[in-house]
Design a protein with these regions (language model features):
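Conserved amphipathic alpha-helical segments that form helical-bundle/coiled-coil interaction surfaces
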Residues: 1-57, 65-78, 83-94
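C-terminal effector-binding regulatory domain of bacterial HTH transcription factors
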Residues: 82-116
Length: 116
């Protein structure tokens, strides 16, 4: 029920939403039933956690995560596996692109600050 709540009931705390997001993705991988894939996913998640959290520093990305996770869950509940997989891929690609933009912006700010 975390992801399928009205907008007014969404948690604005990026750190908490980041933890829920991580659990959501781990649950999806675990549901596939491949223990080795789940183990590898957990290992990768541990390694990239600090970078992934950048995605939850902006309210727009928190809202988008709620919307995207809700759509993925609805597709799964309706047994539309291909649609769920497509939505999940799009969600991950969007998140990666946003984190990349945030990272580049932070690097730019650091360079500008260092040049002063």
């Amino acid at each position: 029920k975390i992801w399928q709540v009205p907008a007014a009931e969404r948690c604005p705390d990026g750190a908490l939403v980041s933890q829920w997001d991580e659990a959501f993705h781990c649950s999806l991988v675990a549901a596939a039933g491949n223990a080795e894939m789940a183990r590898v996913h957990r290992d990768v998640t541990e390694r990239i956690r600090i970078i992934r959290r950048l995605d939850f520093t902006k309210q727009a990305r928190i809202d988008a995560t709620y919307d995207e996770h809700s759509k993925i869950l609805k597709a799964i509940q309706r047994k539309r596996g291909e649609q769920a997989a497509m939505l999940l891929r799009a969600h991950i690609e969007t998140s990666q692109a946003e984190v990349r933009k945030i990272t580049l912006h932070q690097v730019h700010l650091a360079r500008v600050g260092a040049a002063r």
